[in-house]
A protein has these predicted regions:
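Extended repeat-based solenoid scaffolds, especially LRR ectodomains
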Residues: 264-340
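Acidic, Ser/Thr- and Gly/Pro-rich intrinsically disordered linkers and low-complexity segments
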Residues: 53-70, 299-322, 409-430
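Long, well-ordered core segments of solenoidal/helical folds
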Residues: 104-105, 358, 404-408
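Amphipathic alpha-helical interface segments used for dimerization/assembly
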Residues: 122, 255, 334, 362, ...
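Alpha-helical bundle/repeat cores within regulatory domains of eukaryotic proteins
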Residues: 368-450
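P-loop NTPase catalytic cores that bind/hydrolyze ATP
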Residues: 246-253, 328-332
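Elongated alpha-helical scaffolds that mediate protein-protein interactions in large eukaryotic proteins
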Residues: 1-232, 243-249, 256-273, 285, ...
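Long, repeat-rich segments with strong aromatic
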Residues: 312-374, 386
C-alpha cells in the first residue's frame, strides 16, 4: 500500500499524478499525520513547483471548478500544515522562491482568492522558516515595493505587517533585517499611498499598517513614525487639494494611534523591546504633538457645516447636512488630544474654540451617538483636568450647565436646539437621543463638585441647576440604578461606576451567589401553571441549568 488513504491502495510513485492526490478527501489529514510515503512524495521539487503554480497562476475561466477552487485550496493547505521538509524544499531553492513571489509582479493578475492563498503561504514561511525567508527578501528588495503597491488587498497587507515586524508575533532572530527595512524607507512608501491612490481600501490598509507599527514595530520604525517630520507628511497628504476624505480620516487614525495612551502592548513584546533598546515605549514627543497642533486650525475649518448643502433624508426627517465620517474623526482626534494631558494642547484648543465647537455639534446632531460618546469624553477630560482655565472655559465660555438645562426643557427636535437635524413636516418631533449622555455628564459634574471648588461654585450660582437636580436628575438616577433591580447586577458591583466604558469584563469579581439568587428569584413566579407554554418551559429549563452551573462555580471558587 503506497499511502494509507482510501482509494490509493493501487497507486505507486511512478504512475501517480499530483492532481489525483489533490482530489482525495483525506489528503490534508494524512499530511497533518505526517504520513511518511505521502510526505516523501510531496517534498520533491517537481511536486512543490506544481503546488506553487496552483497558488500563484490564475486559472482559465473555462477550466474545471476543482481546478479553479479545490486544487489551489488544497495546495495552500499542504503548505500551511507546516511540514518541515516541504517548507525546506521551498525556501532552499531560489527558483521555487522566485516562482512564489512572481505573484507580486505588476503584470501578474492579482485575484483576491489566490492573494489569500499566497499570503497564507508567505506568513507560514515567516513563522517556520524566518531566516531563509528574510534573507531572500533582503536579496530582492523589489519585493517590498511590490507588496506596498498591492496594499489594497487585505491579505497582502497582512503579509506586509508581518514582514516589518508590526505584529504580536515577534521575530527576535532577525533584528538586523528590521533595520534594513528601515533603511529602504518602507514607511515612506506606505504613507505615500495616501497621495498616489484614490482607493478608500488602499488608504484604510495603509493606515492599518501604520497603526500596527505604533503598537508592535521595532524601535527604529516606531521612532520614525512618531517623528514630527513623518506626522507632517501625513497631514500634507490629508490636506492636498482634490484628495478624497478617506485620506483625512485614515491619517487621523494614525495620529490617534500615536497619541492614545491606552493602546494595547503585550508583555512578550515589552520584553522584546527591552532587549533591543534601553528606553521605554515610543510615544508622540512634545515636538510631534506641536506638529499636530499646527494643523489643528485647518482641521477645525472642516468642522464647519454651515456651508455644506447636501441633505440626507432620514426616518424622522432630514440631516442638513449629515455630519460625515471625516468630521467625526476630527472630534475623536480632539478627544484623544485632550486625554494626553498636554497643557500646550489644552491652551491651543481653547484659543481656537475647538471645545465650544464640538459641544455645539453635540446638540445639533442629537441622534449621532458616536459623536456624543467622543464629546462626552472631551467634556470629562476638561472637567478632570488640573488646569483651572480649561475647567472655567467649559463651564463659563461653553456654558455647559446652561446648555444641559436648555436641552432638558426642550427634549424634542427643534430648529433652535438641533439646527441641522430637522423633523419631517406633519410628524410629531421625536425625543432627542443624547439624554443618557447628558445624565452622565451631569452626574460627573456632581461627583467632581465634591473635590473641585470651581465646579461647586459654578453649580451653586445656577439657580436652575438645583431645581433640576432635585426634581429630575435624582429621580432619574434612582430609576436607572440597575443595582437595585431584582434581576440587575450583583450587589458586589455597587461600588463601581455605572456603565463604565473603560471597565474590562475580565477584571470583574462577580458575586456568584448573588447571581444565582437573583436568577432564581426572577424565574420562580408564574411557572407552575399546568397550561404554561413551551417557550416558558424552555426559559425555566435554561434558568435552572444556569443556576446549577453558577452554584458549581461557587463551590469550586470557595472550596
Amino acid at each position: 500500500m503506497f499511502w494509507h488513504v482510501p482509494g490509493l491502495s493501487a497507486a505507486s510513485p511512478e504512475n501517480f499524478k499530483l492532481e489525483d492526490l489533490l482530489d482525495e478527501d483525506e489528503i490534508i489529514q494524512e499530511c497533518k499525520a505526517l504520513n511518511t510515503r505521502l510526505i516523501n512524495f510531496l517534498r520533491d521539487k517537481v511536486q512543490v513547483e506544481l503546488l506553487l503554480r496552483y497558488i500563484v497562476e490564475e486559472t482559465p475561466e473555462d477550466a474545471e471548478k476543482k481546478r479553479i477552487f479545490r486544487f489551489p485550496f488544497i495546495a495552500c493547505e499542504i503548505f500551511i500544515c507546516e511540514v518541515d521538509v516541504i517548507l525546506k524544499t521551498l525556501v532552499e531553492d531560489e527558483d521555487l522562491m522566485n516562482l512564489l513571489f512572481s505573484f507580486l509582479k505588476p503584470d501578474h493578475p492579482h485575484g483576491t482568492l489566490l492573494a489569500g492563498y499566497f499570503g497564507k503561504v508567505v506568513i507560514c514561511l515567516m513563522l517556520r522558516k524566518t531566516l531563509p525567508l528574510m534573507n531572500y527578501v533582503q536579496g530582492h528588495p523589489e519585493i517590498v515595493s511590490q507588496l506596498v503597491d498591492l496594499i489594497g488587498i487585505t491579505s497582502i497587507m497582512e503579509v506586509l505587517i508581518r514582514l516589518i515586524g508590526a505584529d504580536e508575533t515577534m521575530y527576535t532572530s532577525y533584528a538586523d533585517s528590521m533595520q534594513w527595512l528601515d533603511d529602504i524607507q518602507v514607511l515612506e512608501m506606505i504613507v505615500d499611498k495616501f497621495s498616489s491612490s484614490d482607493s478608500a481600501e488602499v488608504h484604510a490598509n495603509a493606515a492599518e499598517i501604520l497603526c500596527a507599527v505604533t503598537r508592535y514595530a521595532p524601535p527604529a520604525l516606531a521612532t520614525k513614525i512618531s517623528s514630527p517630520s513623518f506626522v507632517g507628511r501625513l497631514f500634507h497628504h490629508a490636506f492636498e487639494d482634490s484628495r478624497p476624505k478617506s485620506v483625512l480620516v485614515h491619517s487621523l487614525s494614525v495620529c490617534i494611534s500615536l497619541l492614545d495612551p491606552k493602546r494595547l502592548v503585550t508583555a512578550s513584546y515589552q520584553a522584546f523591546r527591552s532587549q533591543l533598546s534601553h528606553g521605554t515605549l515610543v510615544t508622540a514627543s512634545p515636538e510631534t504633538v506641536n506638529g499636530m497642533l499646527d494643523s489643528l486650525g485647518d482641521l477645525l475649518k472642516l468642522l464647519d457645516v454651515s456651508s455644506a448643502e447636501n441633505i440626507l433624508p432620514t426616518t424622522y426627517g432630514s440631516l442638513q447636512p449629515p455630519l460625515g465620517k471625516h468630521r467625526l474623526k476630527i472630534v475623536e482626534f480632539i478627544s484623544v488630544l485632550l486625554s494626553i494631558g498636554s497643557e500646550v494642547a489644552e491652551m491651543r484648543l481653547i484659543q481656537l474654540g475647538a471645545i465650544k465647537h464640538v459641544i455645539d455639534l453635540f446638540f445639533e446632531y442629537p441622534f449621532n451617538n458616536f459623536l456624543h460618546h467622543h464629546v462626552e469624553n472631551i467634556i470629562v477630560s476638561c472637567l478632570e483636568s488640573k488646569q483651572d482655565p480649561l475647567i472655567a472655559h467649559v463651564l463659563d465660555e461653553c456654558k455647559l450647565v446652561t446648555r444641559i438645562l436648555e436641552a432638558e426643557k426642550n427634549s424634542a427636535l427643534s430648529v433652535n436646539l438641533t439646527k441641522h437635524t430637522l423633523s419631517a413636516e406633519g410628524k410629531t418631533a421625536p425625543r432627542v437621543g443624547f439624554v443618557g449622555h447628558i445624565t452622565r455628564i451631569a452626574n460627573k459634574l456632581i461627583q467632581l463638585s465634591n473635590s473641585n471648588s470651581t465646579i461647586q461654585s459654578h453649580l451653586q450660582q445656577n439657580s436652575g441647576w438645583a431645581e433640576w437636580h432635585g426634581s429630575i436628575l435624582t429621580k432619574r438616577n434612582a430609576v436607572e440604578n440597575v443595582y437595585q433591580w431584582v434581576c440587575g447586577r450583583p450587589t458586589s458591583l455597587q461600588d463601581r461606576g455605572r456603565d463604565s466604558d473603560d471597565e474590562d469584563f475580565r477584571d470583574r469579581d462577580y458575586d456568584v451567589a448573588a447571581l444565582a439568587s437573583n436568577l432564581s428569584q426572577a424565574f420562580k413566579y408564574g411557572i407552575s401553571n399546568e397550561d404554561v407554554d413551551e417557550v416558558s418551559i424552555f426559559f425555566l429549563f435554561f434558568a435552572r441549568v444556569s443556576i446549577f452551573f453558577l452554584n458549581i462555580t461557587l463551590l469550586l471558587r470557595y472550596s
